[in-house]
């Protein structure tokens, strides 16, 4: 039979946004948190709509939904909502939209995703958690205040501080360092256009966070 696979929220957000734009004549932007895939940006650009980047926390996207500003908004931690729907993260609507998408396109999800990648490009994302001592955490916070020039040998083209420190790199990749408010953990997010670059970014993740 067909290979079964789990699809990440990041991938689902890209596919669902594309599906909504292909099947509804809704006006409005797309929104995602700073920690969420730029696949959403690529789909938004393809459909010629604006992209809004928010801090982490669904309330920011919920607010945009409540004011009818966006077609869809979502986060990599599996929360999304759509225009005219509740301003809360709703996994049920996500599942229903995926079912609708598969039924209307008459293709398995794997094909829908590979077709989307062929259309807008491939985006691969990973999240790592690093446990830090208080001393390491203090040093990491100080390090992040300086704008890093390179990450894993790639030039930083832009630093975004919507929530944590996000470095957008020259090769359409990015990394984000965020401190958990509740535990001595640093979250490190990385995204690249190919597996080799992603591996490189993740291998450097801990050293980059600790500034060693």
Task: Name the predicted role of every residue range.
Residues 1-3, 15, 22, 26-212:
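Phosphate-binding and adjacent anionic-ligand microenvironments
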Residues 8:
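Polar interaction faces of repeat-based domains
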């Amino acid at each position: 039979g067909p290979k079964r696979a789990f699809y990440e929220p990041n991938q689902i957000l890209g596919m669902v946004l594309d599906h909504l734009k292909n099947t509804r004549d809704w006006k409005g932007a797309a929104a995602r948190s700073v920690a969420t895939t730029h696949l959403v940006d690529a789909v938004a650009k393809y459909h010629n709509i604006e992209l809004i980047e928010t801090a982490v926390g669904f309330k920011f996207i919920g607010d945009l939904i409540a004011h009818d500003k966006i077609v869809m908004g979502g986060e990599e931690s599996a929360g999304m909502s759509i225009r005219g729907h509740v301003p809360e993260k709703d996994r049920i609507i996500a599942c229903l939209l995926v079912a609708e998408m598969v039924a209307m396109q008459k293709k398995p999800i794997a094909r829908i995703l590979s077709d989307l990648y062929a259309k807008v490009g491939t985006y691969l994302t990973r999240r790592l958690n690093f446990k830090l001592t208080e001393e390491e955490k203090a040093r990491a916070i100080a390090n992040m205040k300086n704008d890093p020039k390179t990450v894993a040998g790639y030039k930083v083209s832009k630093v975004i501080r919507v929530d944590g420190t996000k470095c957008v790199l020259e090769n359409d990749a990015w990394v984000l360092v965020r401190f958990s408010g509740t535990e001595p953990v640093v979250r490190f997010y990385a995204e690249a256009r190919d597996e080799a670059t992603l591996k490189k970014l993740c291998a450097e993740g801990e050293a980059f966070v600790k500034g060693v």
